[in-house]
Amino acid sequence: MPELPEVETSRRGIEPHLVGATILHAHIRNGRLRWPVSDEIYRLSDTPVLSVQRRAKYLLLELPDGWIIIHLGMSGSLRILPEALPAEKHDHVDLVMSNGKILRYTDPRRFGAWLWTKELEGHNVLAHLGPEPLSDEFNGEYLQQKCAKKKTAIKPWLMDNKLVVGVGNIYASESLFAAGIHPDRLASSLSTEECDLLARVIKAVLLRSIEQGGTTLKDFPQSDGKPGYFAQELQVYGRKGEPCRVCGTPIVATKHAQRATFYCRHCQK
């Protein structure tokens, strides 16, 4: 599933081609996604794009009369095409732009979403989200306050969008390794120093992944079709049985709620 760095990479990739250009029309080949493509998107015509923003894992296209909310789901991706190239089986949505470019949405599993709203504030998919992990609001003090009475393991708690948005499975595993914290530790057991460190390394890991264009494991390419390169720097995720890059101990893989967790028994306490 694309996580925050992959979505931010998409935002940065498509923004220069959309902002200042006009959507001539939308071509919806298959509107049966996680939720049906909103009727307003079918009717788009001669509509300028004012900005391309991101909230959590949602891409937000600002238009004069409302917003398109895009979620990539499990396997979705966006590409900028220089012209109207023939569509393939899983190419479900095109935005045809006045500058000759095409924004093409591809989603083999069709678990993404293209929604429309007049106002972002209060929209049900955005209403209950925690702070952005790269914001000043997300820091050690905030994390300690939220963890203090939480009797659940720290890894699934980090992946809860009510705590902080966009820290998915890959980056939760990588951040906990960087902080030396075992994923099964109770959130309430973290010290002030550990919360400070964890907040800092989450920011560092996410920023580094964004710089590398995200992590390409199976489905996610960048908006230009190229892979993300952070996978080459992964310390624990997807490395079951391989030696820890720090101590040489074999990386362990377990499952919690059907999600894989990777860690080093020696480095993480």
UniProtKB/Swiss-Prot annotation:
Ranges annotated as FPG-type zinc finger: 235-269
Family: Belongs to the FPG family.
UniProt superkingdom: Bacteria
Residues given in the record as DNA binding sites: H90, R109, K150
Documented EC number(s): 3.2.2.23, 4.2.99.18
Annotated NCBIfam families: fpg (TIGR00577), PRK01103.1 (NF002211)
Pfam families recorded: Fapy_DNA_glyco (PF01149), H2TH (PF06831), zf-FPG_IleRS (PF06827)
Annotated InterPro entries: DNA_glyclase/AP_lyase_DNA-bd (IPR015886), DNA_glyclase_Znf_dom_DNA_BS (IPR015887), Formamido-pyr_DNA_Glyclase (IPR020629), FPG_cat (IPR012319), MutM-like_N-ter (IPR035937), Ribosomal_uS13-like_H2TH (IPR010979), Znf_DNA_glyclase/AP_lyase (IPR000214), Znf_FPG/IleRS (IPR010663)
Stated role: Involved in base excision repair of DNA damaged by oxidation or by mutagenic agents. Acts as a DNA glycosylase that recognizes and removes damaged bases. Has a preference for oxidized purines, such as 7,8-dihydro-8-oxoguanine (8-oxoG). Has AP (apurinic/apyrimidinic) lyase activity and introduces nicks in the DNA strand. Cleaves the DNA backbone by beta-delta elimination to generate a single-strand break at the site of the removed base with both 3'- and 5'-phosphates.
Catalytic residues identified in the record: P2, E3, K57, R259
Subunit: Monomer.
Co-factor(s): Zn(2+)
Protein name: Formamidopyrimidine-DNA glycosylase
Catalyzed reactions per annotation: Hydrolysis of DNA containing ring-opened 7-methylguanine residues, releasing 2,6-diamino-4-hydroxy-5-(N-methyl)formamidopyrimidine; 2'-deoxyribonucleotide-(2'-deoxyribose 5'-phosphate)-2'-deoxyribonucleotide-DNA = a 3'-end 2'-deoxyribonucleotide-(2,3-dehydro-2,3-deoxyribose 5'-phosphate)-DNA + a 5'-end 5'-phospho-2'-deoxyribonucleoside-DNA + H(+)
Entry GO MF terms: 8-oxo-7,8-dihydroguanine DNA N-glycosylase activity; class I DNA-(apurinic or apyrimidinic site) endonuclease activity; damaged DNA binding; zinc ion binding
Keywords: DNA damage, DNA repair, DNA-binding, Glycosidase, Hydrolase, Lyase, Metal-binding, Multifunctional enzyme, Zinc, Zinc-finger
Cofactor note: Binds 1 zinc ion per subunit.
